[in-house]
């Protein structure tokens, strides 16, 4: 009797496990992005192009903290004269979501600016405090 009971439990367990592991859904493709200039080059250029179709952006510096990134660089027209201004210093803020860098607007992530204490990190800021100055104050 005990052998029959153990065999029955084993068969039921195998059936349950087989049901859990078989699926017609494809497995999710995931991954985590890296915080490098190379990984942020395309998202930063896409942000520049969103501001103007002819814009180009070159990343000079990159700061990263807690799944967030701030790029600092020069934003300007692709046809800027070689002997003239190339563009303006510009920062872009990104948040990592899996394998992608998602652009974030300062008004959505920097919180409420305090003119009496301009360098204070706002309580309602979403961006990490380590990136607040470079992403929100410059």
Range-by-range predicted roles:
Residues 58-63:
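Short amphipathic beta-strand and strand-loop transition segments with alternating hydrophobic
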Residues 1-10:
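N-terminal export and membrane-targeting signals
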Residues 28-56:
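Short, non-transmembrane alpha-helical segments in secretory-pathway proteins
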Residues 26, 40-42, 70, 116-117:
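Secreted/processed peptides and extracellular or luminal domains of membrane proteins
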Residues 70-138:
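Extracytosolic low-complexity repeat regions of secreted or lipid-anchored proteins
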Residues 21-23:
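Bacterial signal peptide processing site
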Residues 16-19:
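C-terminal motif of bacterial Sec signal peptides marking the signal peptidase cleavage site
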